Amino acid sequence: MPLPKSEAYAYTDGASSGSRGPGGYGVVLTWKGKIKEISGGEQNTTNQRMEVTAACIALETIDEGQVVTIYSDSSYLVNCMRRGWYKKWLENGWLNYLKEPVANRDLWERLLKATKRHQDVRWRKVKGHSKTAAAPHKTGNDRADELAVAAKMATPRWYLQVVVDEVTVSREVQYGDHARRS
């Protein structure tokens, strides 16, 4: 087996407003002696979609052929990859154990493709959002969380307001605790 070009570490996190709404992802990468931060958001998403998106972005950004360790506080993401849930989904035609379509299939397919780009990908579950945790990877996870929350807050919210015989479209942009209508 060829030696990896280098070892890379990725701290990933996702954030969303409720079960559906604006969301963001945050990624902190360390490899080649450098640190790279990436974040982004979507208007109508879930926390789970943002968690998986963050892992996809991490693996797609890191040069091919690496040994990568992904640190995430998402049991959904880490358990799927470490326990091989996706293997059953593939065998069952992307149906879960209830014979229902697997949620977020598009992202799982993207993640599996991104994983194949690397020599080895290791998945590590970390405790998230703990003010007392002294784990060595807490700083990376906390920073990924900050990036995800900031991206979520910067993602505009769109509403359609219908009035009898008149249609008005308004845009509400959320900035921290302040809202502005235009």
Regions found by a protein language model. Name each.
Residues G93-N104, A150-V163:
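Short, surface-exposed, charge-dense and proline/glycine-enriched linear segments
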Residues M1-R49, T53, I57-Q66, M81, ...:
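RNase H-like nuclease fold core
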Residues G33, R49, Y76, N92, ...:
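Charge-rich, low-complexity amphipathic helices
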Residues R124-G128, W158-E166:
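Short, surface-exposed recognition loops or helix-turn segments adjacent to catalytic cores
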Residues T12-P22, E37, C56-G140:
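RNase H catalytic domain
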